[in-house]
Amino acid sequence: MPTKERHIAMMGYRSVGKSSLCIQFVEGQFVDSYDPTIENTFTKIERVKSQDYIVKLIDTAGQDEYSIFPVQYSMDYHGYVLVYSITSQKSFEVVKIIYEKLLDVMGKKYVPVVLVGNKIDLHQERTVSTEEGKKLAESWRAAFLETSAKQNESVGDIFHQLLILIENENGNPQEKSGCLVS
């Protein structure tokens, strides 16, 4: 099968770990320092169900509730990773606003999304429950994962699940494995 190229935008409030998730996925390392992102692009070849994908990740600048949705992220993107920190209720609220703006700008009722609760290594500081994340993802018909970029926990699963959602949206359903990651 020929390799397919898929463009994915990482979106969320500032300091939730979007860049750390990208770097962990692409380079296999965790960068501890925080340097606010303007925009970075990462590329990795990923195989899902015997299909190779060139995954282009766009690591966006952090958004807030007042951000105007960047129109360029509504064109030529196949899927979205919306990230919040389990230690920040504010980031959870902002991700809801980003999702609504995304649907509004795209003029659609559904887009392939994985909702990610990051920083589970900081579980003692948790302010957003797993149940809250699951309920929100269900209401969006999105996949949901809790991750730790620092400990590389479930990072690859984000992109694996999103690629499957994208293929299903494009009318190419993947066979089901019977395995659920939550």
UniProtKB/Swiss-Prot annotation:
- What positions does the entry give for GTP binding? 15, 17-20, 31, 34, 37, 118, 121, 149
Keywords assigned by UniProt, alphabetized: Cytoplasm, Endoplasmic reticulum, Golgi apparatus, GTP-binding, Hydrolase, Lipoprotein, Magnesium, Membrane, Metal-binding, Methylation, Nucleotide-binding, Prenylation
Protein known as: GTP-binding protein Rheb homolog
Name of the encoding gene: Rheb
Segments carrying motif Effector region: 34-42
The GO biological-process annotations, alphabetized, read as: apical protein localization; carbohydrate homeostasis; cholesterol homeostasis; G1/S transition of mitotic cell cycle; insulin receptor signaling pathway; lipid homeostasis; multicellular organism growth; negative regulation of autophagy
**One Pfam family of this chain:** Ras
Query: Which sequence positions carry the modification called Cysteine methyl ester?
Result: 179
Q: What class of enzyme is it?
A: hydrolase
Q: How does it sit in the membrane?
A: Lipid-anchor
